[in-house]
């Protein structure tokens, strides 16, 4: 058997712990991966089944309920002293007998704690009290989970084949009883578009960003070669939602030598609140039409082409080509590049999300290079950071 021994896993944990203490890149993720491997090596099959089909589904359902009754907010408000079951029952409106059972499972799953007759929040549960995480909980439970639950029946009915790339006949449509694509459904089903954007805003929270030190060399590859006589635009975020990535970029490199431009669907741009302090321009743009901003230093996309099949992904990339200044403009794709030999959980998680919602997939390096080549571009380099699922693919005109 190729399964790692408990001894070798423990050795890996010891090494990763030392790296973590020294704040080495990827140490936290390595510790988590080794810890998961240890559990897998120690669990007997019955424990694995109970954990997979009882513990985790119950946990996600309780957390979704907790979002409805503001449980984590109340626990956070009681920081230090904690809150007993009767008082928490009064604040949440959940019967004390039921609440005690639900909360005990959260304690068993290390989400909250119980000490001296009172429930206490943790760093994790306090974080989950924030609005963007509350929205994320609702999105993942209400939208994603039913799509995963549909896998067995859907794939049985279609003969265990990959869904068509139309995006209108997959597990998501079967689960939500709709003929709309995932994105169309979000736009038409309030408030899930807002929840989705909140989820995307926290998707990489706490992880290294593409423009952080040690990831992509922004100053060397982007800013140092900026030429305002070619274009006064430094970076165009194509399909950038509400501008979370541009905000991060601006906060790290201001003052910038040129403009930042955000592009997304008209509905998304229209939903953005007015903000005079915003450091970028927000404009509506359809990614299936030619890029209107010409000769910018860079055109950036975060998790955009991965939501489409090869044909559409090539069209999206090709629409950038006429706007590029040869030898100057760069195309930057912040995407998962799946390792065929050592896939990490964060990458396969997103691949399953793509399968469930959009009938598409995360791509390997060879598959990404094919997309770029077919669009008239060439990959210059692929930048990665230890423990981070997404890479930064830099390309230019072929």
UniProtKB/Swiss-Prot annotation:
One term under GO cellular component: cytosol
GO biological process, one term: mycophenolic acid biosynthetic process
Pathway in which the depicted protein is active: Secondary metabolite biosynthesis; terpenoid biosynthesis
Function: O-methyltransferase; part of the gene cluster that mediates the biosynthesis of mycophenolic acid (MPA), the first isolated antibiotic natural product in the world obtained from a culture of Penicillium brevicompactum in 1893. MpaC methylates farnesyl-DHMP-3C (FDHMP-3C) to yield MFDHMP-3C. The first step of the pathway is the synthesis of 5-methylorsellinic acid (5MOA) by the cytosolic polyketide synthase mpaC. 5MOA is then converted to the phthalide compound 5,7-dihydroxy-4,6-dimethylphthalide (DHMP) by the endoplasmic reticulum-bound cytochrome P450 monooxygenase mpaDE.
Matches recorded under Gene3D superfamilies: Vaccinia Virus protein VP39 (3.40.50.150), Winged helix-like DNA-binding domain superfamily/Winged helix DNA-binding domain (1.10.10.10)
Localization: Cytoplasm, Cytosol
Pfam families from the UniProt entry: Methyltransf_2
Catalytic activity of the protein: (4E,8E)-10-(4,6-dihydroxy-7-methyl-3-oxo-1,3-dihydro-2-benzofuran-5-yl)-4,8-dimethyldeca-4,8-dienoate + S-adenosyl-L-methionine = (4E,8E)-10-(4-hydroxy-6-methoxy-7-methyl-3-oxo-1,3-dihydro-2-benzofuran-5-yl)-4,8-dimethyldeca-4,8-dienoate + S-adenosyl-L-homocysteine + H(+)
Main location: cytoplasm
Organism for this UniProt entry: Penicillium roqueforti (strain FM164)
Positions that bind S-adenosyl-L-methionine: 264
Stated name of the protein: O-methyltransferase mpaG
